[in-house]
Every structure is written in structure tokens, then in C-alpha cells.
Amino acid sequence: MTATAAPETNPAFHLSGEALMGLRHLARRGVTPATRTLAGLPGGIVTKRRGRGSEPDDVRLWSEGDDRRHIDRNATARTGILHVRTHHDERDRAVVLLADFRPSMLFGTRRALRSVAAAEALALLGWRVVGDGGRVGLVVAGADEPTALRPAGGERAMTAVTGALASAHARALAQPAAADPPLDALLTLARSLLPSGGHLVLASALDSPGPDFDRLLTLLAESLSIRLILVSDAFERSRPPGFYPFALPDGRRGTVQSARQAAREPAPARLAADERLADYARRGIAGLRLDVEAGPEAYAPLMERLDAVL
């Protein structure tokens, strides 16, 4: 799948701000006030935060078992029926989404480009964050100057984020083929947009991240919460046997052979992705693998899990 072969309206290649805006309904599906108090704790189990929180959330009818201390006097006096006020945690979450649109991300063999999948996942996460009262910012890595938006809250912030993603992606597709610039400087830029204790979520295949990337990422993890969305194309995980032509940004061309793999043998690329995530997890940087072919419906529960630990 090549970026130049598709019409401008093909969603597999071209990001639409309207489509990313539409993901807000998918992102918020099934989210209730009870689930908005999930705590991000280490390990695979998500639990509720203790206590009732400090921020007013909603007023509802009294039900058996409710604490009488939470009775809302105004609503009760107005209706003559007992009402209670619910609360949620006061969390000022500032999250910067870092989208990798460098030339290596403009690749895909099923459903969409890796860059499109990265943007879809980040948009889903962004809608969840602002829906819970958090603030979302953006940094986009490409072959040209990066895009940066400071964290802000509400639908207006996500309108800016989705528009910036679509615009930056269109610029990336229009750029001539080039080598990937390193991601090191983009980490520094993202850090400058966040307060200490903020959250950075990076969506990338991490091809050619730069010689100083791992060291800098580990260093930043001491003051920020960092999460990785490792984007993976099906062809990388399981290549059918055969000969595959390739072309490099510097003009060199050639052919690579993919040998037949035993049916029970795990795909090396899949192992490499999982091992890479495990290595980052040992340094306190948790992450997940995002399969490009799965699509936003499958990404939504993944982003729900990721949101719970931010």
C-alpha cells in the first residue's frame, strides 16, 4: 500500500478532521459516572478510587444504601423527593498526544496506513480525556516542522487537535520521500508543554527513533507518566513467503526474500514488538500494541484501558 496511489478521499490514506471528530461517540460509549473514577494502579487490574471524590458530578434520586450525608437539600426541597449528590475525583490531567507521521509511518498493507491508525487511536484517547475534564495537547512528528498544541480542555481543544492531525497528515503525504528525522527533539518539545506529573502518550512504530531516544525517554519518565502505543502492520508480523521489491528514500531499490515460516512458530516481528514493549515496561514506560488492520472499533477498548492508567 503506497500513499501516492490513493485518491484524496480514501480514508485508508487520508485523515479527515470530521471522521476524527466523529470518534467521540465511539470513545464515550458505555462510560458512566461510576467508571470515571477508575484508578490507574500498577498491574493488570483496574480498581475504583477510594472515597467519594471532591468534585460534584450529578444529582439523582435517593436509593437504598445511599449515605444520608450526601443528600442534596435544594433538589429535595424543590421536588419533595429525596435526592443525593454524587461526586468524582478532582483530577487535572494534562495529556500530550505525540503522533508519528514521519515517512516510515506512511506505510500499510491492510485497511490503512500506520499513521492513520496512530491518529485514530490518539483521537479516541483524547476524546476520553476531555470527556473526563482533562486537558489535551498535541505534538506531530513529520519530515518538516513539527506541529504543537498546548493542552486545553473541552470539545474546542479536541476540535483543534483533530484539525491539526488531519492537516499535518496531509502535509506529510505531500512531502517527497525522505529519511526519518529522529524523535529525540520531539520528546523535548512535548516535555515543554507539560507540567511535572503530566502525561505523554506516543503513537509510533518507533522506526529509526534516533540514537538518544531511549535514554531521553527513560529520563523523562522520572517526571512524566509516559505511555507507548506501538503501531504494528500485519505484514510486519506475518510475511507470506515470496520476493518483495523495495525502494528506499535515498533512491536505492532492491528485492528481499521472505522465507516460509513453520505454522507453529511465533512470528519474529510479533515477538520483537512484544519484547520491545516489555523492555520499556521494565523502565516504567507501559504500552500496548496497536494492530493497524483492527480499526477504531477494536481500538476503543484499548484506549479505555490506557485511559484508566493515566
Task: Describe every region a protein language model picked out.
Residues 2-45, 61-66, 71, 75, ...:
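Exposed, interaction-prone extracellular/peripheral surfaces
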